[in-house]
Amino acid sequence: MVVLDQPAQSGMVVALQANYLEVELDQVSELIPSRLLCTRRTRLSHRGEAVYVGDRVRVEAIDVSHARAVVADVEPRVSFLTRPPVANASTVVVALAVDQPAFDPDQASRFLLTAERTSLAVQLVLTKTDLLEPEALERLRVRLQAWGYPPLLVSTFSGLGLSELKQRLAESSLSVLCGPSGVGKSSLLNALIPELDLRIGSVSGRLQRGRHTTRHVELHHLGAKARVADTPGFNRPDLPDDPRNLEVLFPELRVQLEQHPCRFRDCLHRDEPGCGVTRDWERYPIYRRAVEDLLGLSRPSRGG
C-alpha cells in the first residue's frame, strides 16, 4: 500500500532502468526500503527537466510494500557530464589499456579532452600493465606525464596499484570511471568491490575493440561516503564545438600560454605569424588535427 503519511525523503539517483529511476535514500529506516524504484512527476517532464544518475532528488508517495515512489523535485547540480551523462561528479577517472586494446594516442587524447571539458579533477589510470615489459611501461608513464597526466599504473592480474586507486576513489564523493570498451573497467570495479561480480567482456582480435558489457550508468558504493559510476564504454568521444576552446583542454598548451601568453586573443596556434606557441610537444599534431576538424565542421557547405 502507499504510505500517504510518510514525509518526503531525499536521496540520490543511482541507476536508470528503462523509464524508472532507482533512488537510494539518505536516511536508512526500518519502515522504508533503502532503495526505491521511482517514476517522475509529470510536471518535471512538462518543464523539460531530465533526471540523471547522480542527481540529488526528493521522493514522495512512497509505496513501502512494493518499494516504489515518485521523484518530485531535482536539486540544483554542482556539475554535469554529458557523455556519459552523470550529475554531481567530483572526479573523472579515464581508464586506458596499455595493450589489448593497444594504446592509441589519438583515442586517449579524445577521452582526456572530454574529461578536461568538465572542469573536474582528472585522474588517468593505465590498465593491464602486466602486459608490458617494465621498460616499455616506464616509457609510457613518462610520456603521459609530459602530457600533464601522471598516470596511476594498475593491474587486476598482479594487483599493482589497486590499493592506491581505491584510496584515491574513496577521497572523492563521486568518481566517474570512463574509457574505451575493453580496457577493463568492469574488471577494475570487480577487484575494488568484489561483491559486484560485474560481467567482463573480451577484445575483438581484428579490430582491437572491446565489447560493451556495461549497458547503462550505475553508481556503486566505495567505502562509507564515496561512490563510483560505472559507465558504458565508447570509442570516439566528440570534440568541443569551438576550436578556440581547445587550448584550455591540453595541459601542456595551457602551461605554455600561462608562461608566455600569445599576443593574439583569437589565435588558434597554427601558422599565424607571431604566434608564441612552440610546436615541439608530442600532442601538437593531435591539437592541430582537432582544430582543422572543427574548422571543417564549422564551414558552411556550398550548394551546387
From Swiss-Prot:
Names of required cofactors: Zn(2+)
Gene Ontology molecular functions: GTP binding; GTPase activity; metal ion binding; rRNA binding
Zinc is among the record's keywords: yes
Subcellular localization: Cytoplasm
Residues where GTP binds: T127, K128, T129, D130, G179, P180, S181, G182, V183, G184, K185, S186, S187
Major place of residence: cytoplasm
UniProt keyword terms in alphabetical order: Cytoplasm, GTP-binding, Hydrolase, Metal-binding, Nucleotide-binding, Ribosome biogenesis, RNA-binding, rRNA-binding, Zinc
Quaternary structure and partners: Monomer. Associates with 30S ribosomal subunit, binds 16S rRNA.
GO BP term, example: ribosomal small subunit biogenesis
Gene Ontology cellular-component annotations: cytoplasm
Catalytic activity, EC: 3.6.1.-
Positions annotated to bind Zn(2+): C262, C267, H269, C275
GTP-binding listed as a keyword: yes
Cofactor details (free text): Binds 1 zinc ion per subunit.
Domain CP-type G intervals: 78-237
Role, per record: One of several proteins that assist in the late maturation steps of the functional core of the 30S ribosomal subunit. Helps release RbfA from mature subunits. May play a role in the assembly of ribosomal proteins into the subunit. Circularly permuted GTPase that catalyzes slow GTP hydrolysis, GTPase activity is stimulated by the 30S ribosomal subunit.
Entry protein name: Small ribosomal subunit biogenesis GTPase RsgA
UniProt xrefs under PROSITE patterns: ENGC_GTPASE, G_CP
